[in-house]
Structures are given as structure tokens and as C-alpha cells.
Regions:
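Extended, helix-rich architectural segments
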Residues: 1-312, 316, 388, 415-418
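Extended, charged amphipathic alpha-helical segments
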Residues: 265-418
Length: 418
């Protein structure tokens, strides 16, 4: 029977989420919203400082981001004043110091090298893996990803690199592994409880992107309408993090799930999980396992969400979340994490330099020009030349000799006041 009233559809949305084929996804979405809110709260203070560092680093004479707004108002730059305005020069010396570090990294880029580590390792196989890794870096333009992460790390404290897979072409099911660039580090929200500087122990991570609503509807025509998402978020204060006035946030959500499995040990230090084909084969060869233990088997999951609907989902073929963190200075103060780069401690020195050069320019501009001093009658007939002597580059200046000392001596030529 056709649901003409829409009541049944609304009930299904309330029960199974906006996508009926994905019943049970509501728990994943609830946890995802909670985790993103946790990350935003944990990083709110440090990222506000990092954003200020980035704006300061990108300061130029056009945007004047290196001058405090209240100072600009008092100096007249924001009010268009010309009578009492004072110069606010920006001589940005920070890029040269940042580039001293990043250029060193460009000359000595970190490389991935596979080294045989035990008696079972194969040197030839290690060389094969090294070749595969070099090929992945080549087809990915990995140098750009490394350089971007380093630039962000040095300038304001944190950069990110990601690993992803893409289909080789439109007519193939084969996929290439690639190393991707993350230009905007503020779009990444990683588990704040990590201890590893690269984030290898992260339990979850978000890579967010805000797209126009029209673009969202074009990319995901089968997803729940935006009006439905807004109705689902009624009473949820975090809805503003996902749905804006003209945009909607799409997030790649990586998370780790643990499953209990029994690990069996067989002669020759061979192991296999119970129920797997390898375990059945080893049981046929050796019989009962020597030892067993319960193990948490880790699986990395990936899904693309809008906060209230799962747009795509699949398993990630790896043991770690494929987002690598590149961190600068890292401090934990009273349980709050603070991250900074090279710019943070150079801001006051740069401000002081801007003040100095602005004051020097102001003093030179306001300094009076020394007038010419001469005797009466020496300038008669040449007044126009002498009135413009300090603005025009005359090839010569003429004067009248004024003999007044009674002895016929010519008085000295006009001179500038000292």
C-alpha cells in the first residue's frame, strides 16, 4: 500500500535513520557527533592561537594582519583619515625564517625505507617493497604533501598527510595507493587522547569539508534531504557544526573497532585465529593448538557522513588510521593541549620591528626642510627658481651679487640653514 501521508516514512526515519537500508547506523552517527564535539572542545583554545599565528605569518602591507585592530584605529588607517594618519608599515621578515627551516626539509626530505629485521626477512623482498613505495610517492606527487605538512608544522604548529586509494581509471576496478596532501590542517580533528606524535595510536579521526548545499544535493541525490536532516537535529545543539546557512559539512570519519577472537599457537611458532582457513589447515597438520589466548582484533572503518546520515562506508585495508600528524611544539598545561610553531615566539619581535620602521618613516616625513639663507637682494629676479629649489632639480641657481660692505667685496652665496 502506498504511503501517501508520509507517516510511515517518518517513522522509518525515526527508527533507522534517514537511510532505511542502514538501520543501526544511528549509534555510529551519535558517537561520531559526540567525538567531533569532543575534538572541537579540546582543540578550541590552541587552534584559535594557531589561526592567529597563520594570519600573522600571512600578513602583508595590503591586509595589515600584523597590526592590532585597536592600534590601526588610533593611527587612522581604518578610518581613511589623511590629516592625522600615521604610517602602519608591514615589513614581514617571518617568511625568510620559516623558509630557512622548510628549505632544509626540501633538501633532505624524509624517506620511507624497508629494512629486513629478523631471520625470516628477505632482502630481495625488502628491495621490492622499497620500489613499490617509491612508485607510490612518484604517482602521488608526495613531495607536495610532505612540503605542505612541513610548512604548516613550522608556521603554526601542525600539519597532516593522508594515505588513500583511488581507482586507476574509469574502466577499472584496480586501485592505486596514494599519499595525499591536506592543505587545511584545521579541517582535521584527531583523537585528542593520542600520545604518539604522529597519531599512530589514534582511535578515530575526522577530515571535514564544508560544501554548498546545491553541490551537496548534486553529489548525493539519494541522501536524505537537508530539511530531513534539520528535523533530525531539532534539540541537538551540535547541528550548527554540520549545517550552516548556505553550506553543509561532509566528514570522512575513520574509527577503529575491536573484535574478540581466539588466537591459536601451533608448532613452529605458527599462529592463526580460530575459524579461519589458516587455522583449519594448521589443525589438520598439527592437531590441537599448543596455546590459545583471547585477542582484540583491530579493524579500521571508514565512512562519509553529514552528521545525521551515512553517505558512504567501507572497511579500510590497514591496521592504522591513514592520517599522519606532523607536529611542532607541543605542550600540555593543566590538561589542555597547546601546539605552536616558529611564528608564535617571533610575533612580538616582528611587531616591534614594524613599529620601528613606521616611526622612522614618520620622523623622516615630518622633518622640516632646511631653508636657504641669503642677503637681501640676492634673490631678486630669480624668485621662482629659489622657491622651487627643494622640489625641482634645477641644473643651476643664479643670484645677484650684493656689495654692501663698503669695500667692494662680494658677500657669500646663499647657504642652507644647518
Amino acid at each position: 500500500m502506498k504511503d501517501t501521508t508520509g507517516i510511515v516514512a517518518a517513522a522509518n526515519v525515526a527508527k533507522n535513520g534517514p537511510n532505511p537500508s542502514k538501520g543501526g547506523s544511528e549509534e555510529i552517527l551519535t558517537v561520531a557527533r559526540s567525538r567531533l564535539n569532543t575534538a572541537m572542545t579540546a582543540f578550541s583554545e590552541t587552534r584559535e592561537d594557531e589561526l592567529d599565528d597563520l594570519r600573522f605569518y600571512a600578513g602583508s602591507p595590503d591586509n595589515q594582519w600584523q597590526w592590532p585592530a585597536d592600534v590601526l584605529q588610533t593611527r587612522g588607517s581604518l578610518q581613511g583619515q589623511t590629516i592625522n594618519a600615521r604610517p602602519c608599515l608591514t615589513i614581514n621578515k617571518l617568511p625568510q625564517h620559516v623558509h630557512q627551516v622548510t628549505n632544509e626539509q626540501r633538501m633532505n626530505r624524509p624517506g620511507i625505507k624497508v629494512i629486513p629485521a629478523d631471520d625470516k626477512a628477505d632482502v630481495d623482498m625488502a628491495d621490492v617493497f622499497n620500489g613499490v613505495i617509491r612508485h607510490i610517492e612518484y604517482i602521488s606527487d608526495a613531495d607536495v604533501a610532505y612540503d605542505t605538512a612541513c610548512e604548516n608544522q613550522v608556521s603554526y604548529g601542525e600539519g597532516y598527510i593522508r594515505v588513500l586509494t583511488e581507482y586507476c581509471d574509469d574502466k577499472s576496478f584496480d586501485q592505486d595507493i596514494k599519499i595525499g596532501r591536506i592543505r587545511n590542517s584545521f579541517s582535521v580533528y584527531m583523537d585528542p587522547l593520542i600520545q604518539d606524535p604522529a597519531g599512530a595510536d589514534a582511535r578515530w579521526c575526522f577530515i571535514t569539508e564544508d560544501i554548498p548545499k546545491a553541490e551537496y544535493e548534486r553529489l548525493y541525490p539519494d541522501a536524505a534531504p537537508i530539511s530531513t536532516l534539520m528535523s533530525l537535529g531539532v534539540g541537538d545543539q551540535s547541528i550548527a557544526q554540520w549545517i550552516g546557512e548556505n553550506t553543509i559539512r561532509i566528514a570522512e570519519y575513520f574509527y577503529i573497532e575491536y573484535e574478540k577472537h581466539t588466537l591459536n599457537l601451533y608448532p613452529g611458532n605458527q599462529t592463526a585465529f580460530s575459524g579461519t582457513p589458516e587455522d583449519k589447515m594448521l589443525r589438520e597438520m598439527f592437531g590441537k593448538p599448543i596455546r590459545t589466548r583471547e585477542a582484540d582484533r583491530k579493524k579500521v572503518k571508514w565512512c562519509k557522513i553529514n552528521g545525521y546520515d551515512i553517505l558512504e562506508e567501507r572497511d579500510w585495508a590497514g591496521s592504522y588510521i591513514p592520517v599522519v600528524r606532523v607536529v611542532g611544539n607541543e605542550f600540555e598545561v593543566d590538561g589542555q593541549m597547546y601546539v605552536s610553531g616558529l611564528v608564535r615566539n617571533a610575533k612580538d619581535a616582528q611587531r616591534m620591528y614594524n613599529y620601528w620602521v613606521s616611526q622612522e618613516a614618520e620622523m623622516l616625513a615630518l622633518a622640516p626642510k632646511a631653508p636657504f639663507i641669503g642677503y637681501g637682494g640676492q634673490f631678486e629676479g630669480y624668485e621662482q627658481q629659489w622657491k622651487t629649489a627643494n622640489t625641482n632639480n634645477w641644473p643651476y641657481l643664479e643670484v645677484n651679487p650684493d656689495v654692501t660692505d663698503g669695500q667692494g667685496a662680494v658677500l657669500p652665496l646663499p647657504q642652507r640653514a644647518q
